[in-house]
Amino acid sequence: MNRKGFTLIELLAVIVLITVITLVAVPSIRYASKKIQEKNYDAKLKMIKASAEDYGNDYKEIIQYNSSTTYTDPNDHQTYPSVEVHVSDLLANGYLVKDADIDRDDILDPRDDSSLKNKSITIYIKNNNAYAVLNFN
């Protein structure tokens, strides 16, 4: 009697092996995914900051001479003329492009898919250059 099959012990051993591999791999995959999301978020923040500084440089005379608000630079403790804008302002004026994978005009946080559209940015003029401070929590 020559049977060509697996014994119950062999099947259980394979199931246990697959379970162990899964238990080891899933947390590693989640960790890697979270790290990728954090890197994407950091890249998106850099893009938003650069766009805000471009906006500020284009409108620096208006900010410098017509602004009623100021920003105190924590490095030199000096106050500079400033304006607060939102990500939606940068989108509306063409300084940012909406995320390609959504239908609405928005930029999403890659960590949780929440909107960044209403987040504020302080733009201040120092030494005839615009600097942006992201007011994201």
Locations of regions flagged by a protein language model:
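N-terminal single-pass transmembrane signal-anchor helix
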Residues: N2-I29
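Short, well-structured alpha-helical interface segments that form or flank functional binding sites
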Residues: R3, A43, M47, V85
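Aliphatic-rich helix starts adjacent to a transmembrane/signal segment
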Residues: S28-K49
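N-terminal alpha-helical signal peptides/signal-anchor transmembrane segments
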Residues: K44-I63
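Extracellular/periplasmic head regions of type IV pilus-like filament subunits
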Residues: K60, Q64-S120
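Low-complexity, S/T/G/P-rich flexible repeat/linker segments used as non-globular hinges
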Residues: T122-N137
